[in-house]
Amino acid sequence: MRRFKFQYKETIVTILTENEEFYKTAVKAILEARSEIEDYILHNPDFFTSYEPIECSGGEIINRMCNAAKIAGVGPMAAVAGTIAAYAVEKMIDAGAKLAVVDNGGDIVIHSDRELLVGIYPSKLAFKVPPVDYLAICTSSGKIGHSVSFGKADAATVVARDASVADALATALGNLIGDFGKKELEKTVSEFYGKYSDFVEGILVVKDELVALAGNLPSLAFAESKEDLITKG
């Protein structure tokens, strides 16, 4: 397994795969996805600025983001990182990669032939992810990162089979988290999962010392976050 770092404009990713050829495949896909998004924004500025779903008529990447936004009730840019990560992983799979993991600033898409430990930053929790054909783990935070969140969660994490939806729903979930006690947090998480259970495997929220979860999540473990393994801007 090799670990690569790549940065282009706002996109900062960590890529795990077998060799440099698959890494190059991922980089090419990331640049393709960004190009489509940037071109669409140039002609449709609302796509970039809206905090609510909007009608879109674009290519594959744009349509994925807009469909996810409609499901989650957020703006399409809430799905940008997960969508780009997913597109890169899909191209790596097409090229024959048995290990294709793209972490785009905390929005992670996994195709793996081995167990992986995926940390939930900034908490000390991690998921033990077994070998899996395709899984998205997307996290929104009201305390770190440059993405917009109107909530106060340390981490609002959504695990799903669709990365665009996982990313958009992580934003929506994070927006709901206020200065909650344990019961309020658990109630919010339970209701959110009940509303979106058709789209997600499970959800987890970390707020200060509190943790609430729902659904079918990978096993949890404690793990110290190593600064050099965290993908952030």
Curated annotation (Swiss-Prot):
NCBIfam families for the chain: PRK04334.1-4 (NF003324)
InterPro entries: ApbE-like_sf, MA1715-like, UPF0280
SUPFAM superfamilies, alphabetized: ApbE-like
Native species: Archaeoglobus fulgidus (strain ATCC 49558 / DSM 4304 / JCM 9628 / NBRC 100126 / VC-16)
Family according to the record: Belongs to the UPF0280 family.
Protein name, as recorded: UPF0280 protein AF_0649
